[in-house]
Amino acid sequence: MKKAFPLCAIVALVTLAVSCADSHNKFAKMSDKAFENAMEQYAPLADSMIANRPGRLPHSIKPDGTLADVPPISWVSGFFPGSLWYIYEYTGNEAFKAYAEHFTHYLKKIQYVTKTHDLGFMMYCSYGNAYRLTGKEEYKDVVVTSAKSLSTRFSPAVGCIKSWEPRVGCNGVDQWDFPVIIDNMMNLELLFEATRLSGDSTFHKMAVSHANNTMQNHIRHEDYSTYHVVNYNPTTGAVEHQRTQQGFADNSTWSRGQAWAIYGFTLCYRYTGDVAYLEIANKLADFVIDNPRLPEDAIPVWDYNVGEEGFVPVKEYTPEQIAQKPRDASAAAVMASGMLELATYSNEAQAARLVATAEKMLCSLSSKNYTAKVGENKRMLLMHSVTAFPIGREIDVPLSYADYYYLEALLRWNKIFGAK
């Protein structure tokens, strides 16, 4: 089942004071400004991509300062068309609907790909939003076919969807034969939605199994932080390793990983109504809200435990690298969106905490400290995100998924508080 926002929760939320502004109206104006900025940045970017880089999608900035774009097979390919759909949804601007459809169609063949667990990111952010906003059957069919492709990666023995093909772990010692990453919680939405659209409960059952195993094995229940990678024995389903690939240490908390978990278990509650998911999502959120390591502006460092005693890094860092501590705007954007939805299902006191934190994140992201000036940042919206610090990949740069979840969070705020 797909849960609607409870009326009592919405009424309670509407009464909350907007924490980052003098008034509800001021936050709404900030949201309007963000989407105006998005239109000014993305229209020339879309035009340039169509004219000069057909078939590719913008994602980030390369070390040499040029735009980094990707082919449709990249795991991040769905975020730019998804952002265009969100701009169209917020503004009603038909030009952005045309842009969104154009870039969404680039991904059509990806519905048949079975070599990636990221089909949820790729196809639901693009085709899922396309179907939601247009109702076109062709988009619906692509969503269901994509879910069928994703389901081929599910192992009944493990009870999870395999994230990556077998590889040597980040420490250069472990052999990972069935690695599952916390990010994979985000791809469950594609499976849940496919059951809703097709009536085939197989997808739903796979998603629930994956979520339940993740809840048991990815979460440290003593403090509700998360592991990035859990490697399973592909035959017995036993846990063999709990590690990291993108975090500071195996026992540290990678900031975006925690964000994926909050968002992922919230969407599981939306589709199932299982209170275990609601409870775990709130505990995961509490880890962030009450964390003394969360900076004053609520935009987390790339990992919550960088350089701390008791956390042995997965690679050797210089003192300068440890001291660098770049922020990850993408983690904040994902958390803000997830927390706003979670607030609609939570009791009034917890909802107030969630909304206040999400609003603080969105206010920071909307400030000049994180939002690029029009014409700068290769026309991406947000600055200062991190993909994978341990391997030096995309550090302190814009990222397409930071923009996507930022726009989604602003849309959710407006829907909850009645501005849209």
Regions found by a protein language model. Give the residues of each.
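Bacterial Sec-dependent N-terminal signal peptides
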Residues: 1-29
